[in-house]
Amino acid sequence: MKNSKDYLKRVTADSPRLIPPKLPVGPLVVGGAEVFPGKRQKLDLPAARLPTGTMLSLPVTIINGKKPGPRLWLSAAIHGDELNGVDIIRRVTKALKPHRLSGSVIAVPVVNIFGLLEQSRYLPDRRDLNRAFPGSTRGSLASRLASLFMKEVVSQCTHGIDLHTAAIHRVNLPQIRANLEDPATYDVARAFGAPVMIHASIRDGSLRQAATKRNIPALVYEAGEALRFDEEAIQKGVDGIFRVMAYLEMYASTALSHPLDTQESRETRWVRASRGGIWHRSANLGDVVRHRQPLGFITDTFGDKPVQVRSPMEGVVIGHGQNPLVNQGDALVHVA
């Protein structure tokens, strides 16, 4: 077992800084719409038709600055039940002023429009859109939607932030997941200023993998729970995006709250139930826990025969299940 000091450290702002790329000023074309420097435009990007014949489209906001700079995409609701990012993007795009922007922003608050309508993580065929990238114009619905997003959004950008929440019946501490071995990505992750940033392996078919293959630094922001707005998670997301834009020299803001120190983690573990029963959790999001520290206990339905659940490592609680009814092997507490 590693000592926590080996993989958990404070991240400070005094490391060497990489110079972000700057794209020249000019019209930005998305879905055939031309957005000129100093302008903003909302458009509907046609995606696919429902069985009724109704066309479903991706809502896109393009903000094209008057000065050269990076191009940042913001995306949310790749999983249709993960809603915090929808409001994060609403707040960010409402606040941005094109005449103060260096570079441009392409924001898509709902990528999985089908899942959003059904309040579901998945597409109608039960596929996970975040396992379908980079997609194909001749593949499944998920593959076609991924291909459209890659062509119209990702391929035009220098950086990206994909906004998520925990899956249903779970909740996450605000955190950044990224490839921290890549210096450019590391610096952007640090600039975001989330309570925790995690070196996360790249999953096949994920948007982050597709962006990485194009050498685009991409962050995943995880915070809150499915089908709920969480004000703290939303505000930390908004602040983090503006900090990233300030780091990239895209946008200066004096209204940012001062970021907390970010804890960097290279290892995470889910603590799982050794038996079925009623789960009584004592550990909360953000708690710093010791190795073997009790996180709660499981009883039978009479409240008897308690079994202690302990942390397998030192670290911070970054997520936990919400359902007190557990089966053997269920995920209980996530420690980083």
Model regions: which residues?
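Structured catalytic-domain cores with a bias toward divalent-metal coordination
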Residues: 1-336
